Amino acid sequence: MASFPLLLTLLTHCAGSWAQSVLTQPPSASGTPGQRVTISCSGSSSNIGSNTVNWYQQLPGTAPKLLIYSNNQRPSGVPDRFSGSKSGTSASLAISGLQSEDEADYYCAAWDDSLNG
């Protein structure tokens, strides 16, 4: 079977249309089936540095689905191929054993304390 690249589109979470984007992700990542891919998410002390990170997966034509919560917790039904981690003001999502159905948009999200009030 021929291997083919999978494109994982990474979208930065914005807290409302009026808010400045505060988390930074690379525009895309790709890999071939079976590979391990890591997606980074960079923030600051007011968001990732002091709050937990969630990750969402949006498959084409569907609503976003919670993939990882509280930095590294998987909801029931999410395969253990997906794992999350956080260190300082950065977080990452790792997908091991990449599969064709993983081709999707991935969002990182964290509350930003500077948006209060």
Swiss-Prot record:
Principal localisation: secreted
Positions of the UniProt region annotated as Complementarity-determining-3: 109-117
PROSITE patterns found in the cross-reference section: IG_LIKE
Gene3D superfamilies membership: Immunoglobulins
Domain of life: Eukaryota
MF terms (GO), sorted A to Z: antigen binding
Disulfide bonds: C41-C108
Start and end residues of each stretch annotated as Complementarity-determining-2: 70-72
One Gene Ontology biological process: adaptive immune response
Keyword annotations of the record: Adaptive immunity, Cell membrane, Disulfide bond, Immunity, Immunoglobulin, Immunoglobulin domain, Membrane, Pyrrolidone carboxylic acid, Secreted, Signal
Location of the region described as Complementarity-determining-1 in the Swiss-Prot/TrEMBL record: 45-52
Region (Framework-1), start-end ranges: 20-44
Any single Pfam family the record assigns to this protein: V-set
PANTHER family found in the cross-reference section: IMMUNOGLOBULIN LIGHT CHAIN
Task of the protein: V region of the variable domain of immunoglobulin light chains that participates in the antigen recognition. Immunoglobulins, also known as antibodies, are membrane-bound or secreted glycoproteins produced by B lymphocytes. In the recognition phase of humoral immunity, the membrane-bound immunoglobulins serve as receptors which, upon binding of a specific antigen, trigger the clonal expansion and differentiation of B lymphocytes into immunoglobulins-secreting plasma cells.
Official protein name in the record: Immunoglobulin lambda variable 1-44
